[in-house]
């Protein structure tokens, strides 16, 4: 229609549209979208044309296409999966005799009580989730720090092992993506963001280079990740590693390469769920063994599997923003994320951010 054409023209001329074009961006599909897969999905779309568009409608044709190392194990434990950028990610887990399938409703679906069980576990004991679907990009080289520092409003970690949350902006000073950046070594950085931003993040970084000696490497299909959260998460993880996990030895928003169940992995002390927790990132081939090892003790300490529905509920209650709110329709002040912005440094989009601060905000994210 004419609205789409208008935004496409703005995108071509100004480098960014006025509204979010995620649902029209061809980069919402990855390399997995081969011709044979496209045929399967086209047939599915035709068959679903007159179906009721329930919230969280799950399209099942052509799956699984990018299962994680934990896929079969979690499926056997009741995981009901969703597809994000080709990846299979658990939504929730069927328990207490509930059939392992999708339930649709405009009111309260049957999975609501299952999510409540998962949420309670993360708050009161511990929960574990397969987060392998996240985009995982490495930037390394002698100019890696200067390159990323020029793009990011927040101050990058000054030493290896530091972590920061920051945002990438487009030419209009609006949010392109929220990114967690981990400094693995002096000239090596690891970026984590939402699954469907994978190619967009790579493009944003690639098109922003100015001849810097910085290599951009996609680790999304090579590495897997899981997160363990809750009051008992430290005790559970401690049984699988000799690393010290106390507050003094392993600070909040810090990263260490530690041995877990005999495998060298990166542990990040951070938690999107808002509780005490760690994310564990590393080679795909080790993740199942680590998951099983955590369950040896975790099963005795109230550990439960949880999915994206629980994660989303917990992060909203904590006040953490998500990709749904952080779009190219909002500036940093409008999104309410200025605590992650250092106006005393230079960054791409700083001028537009300053303008937004000086004017009455047309709207703000209310939580």
Feature map (PLM): residue ranges:
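C-terminal catalytic lobe of FAD-dependent flavoproteins
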Residues: 1-66
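Conserved, structured C-terminal
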Residues: 16, 55-82, 89-91, 95, ...
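Active-site-flanking structural segment that lines cofactor/substrate pockets
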Residues: 100-127
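Short amphipathic beta-strand starts and helix->beta connectors
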Residues: 117-124, 169-178, 210-212, 259-267
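Active-site acidic/histidine clusters and adjacent loop/turn architecture
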Residues: 132-134
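Short amphipathic
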Residues: 136-138, 365
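Internal amphipathic helical hairpin motif
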Residues: 142-175, 232-263
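Well-ordered mid-protein domain cores that form the structural environment of catalytic cofactors
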Residues: 154-208
């Amino acid at each position: 229609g004419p609205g789409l054409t208008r935004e496409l023209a703005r995108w071509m001329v100004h480098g960014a549209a006025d509204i979010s074009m995620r649902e029209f961006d061809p980069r919402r599909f990855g390399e997995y979208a081969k011709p044979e897969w496209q045929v399967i999905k086209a047939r599915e779309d035709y068959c679903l044309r007159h179906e009721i568009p329930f919230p969280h409608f799950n399209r099942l044709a052509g799956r699984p296409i990018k299962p994680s190392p934990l896929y079969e194990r979690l499926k056997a434990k009741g995981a009901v999966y969703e597809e994000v950028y080709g990846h299979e990610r658990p939504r929730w887990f069927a328990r207490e005799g509930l059939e392992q399938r999708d339930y649709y409703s405009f009111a309260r679906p049957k999975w609501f009580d299952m999510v409540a069980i998962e949420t309670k576990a993360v708050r009161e004991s511990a929960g574990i989730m397969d987060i392998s679907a996240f985009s995982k990009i490495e930037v390394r080289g002698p100019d890696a720090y200067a390159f990323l520092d020029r793009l990011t409003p927040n101050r990058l970690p000054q030493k290896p092992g530091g972590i920061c949350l920051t945002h990438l902006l487009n030419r209009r000073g609006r949010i392109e993506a929220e990114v967690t950046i981990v400094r693995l070594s002096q000239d090596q950085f690891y970026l984590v963001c939402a699954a469907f931003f994978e190619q967009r993040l790579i493009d944003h970084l690639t098109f922003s280079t100015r001849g810097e000696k910085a290599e951009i490497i996609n680790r999304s299909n090579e590495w897997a990740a899981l997160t363990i959260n809750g009051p008992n998460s430290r005790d559970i993880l401690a049984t699988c590693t000799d690393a010290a996990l106390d507050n003094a030895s392993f600070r909040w928003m810090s990263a260490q390469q530690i041995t877990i169940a005999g495998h060298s992995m990166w542990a990040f002390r951070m938690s999107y769920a808002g509780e005490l927790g760690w994310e564990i990132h590393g080679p795909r081939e080790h993740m199942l063994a680590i998951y099983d090892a955590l369950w040896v003790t975790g099963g005795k300490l109230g550990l439960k599997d949880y999915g994206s529905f629980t994660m989303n509920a917990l992060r909203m209650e904590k006040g953490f923003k998500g990709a749904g709110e952080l779009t190219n329709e909002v500036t940093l002040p409008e999104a309410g994320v200025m605590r992650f912005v250092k106006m005393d440094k230079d960054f791409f989009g700083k001028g537009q951010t300053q303008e937004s601060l000086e004017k009455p905000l047309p709207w703000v994210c209310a939580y």
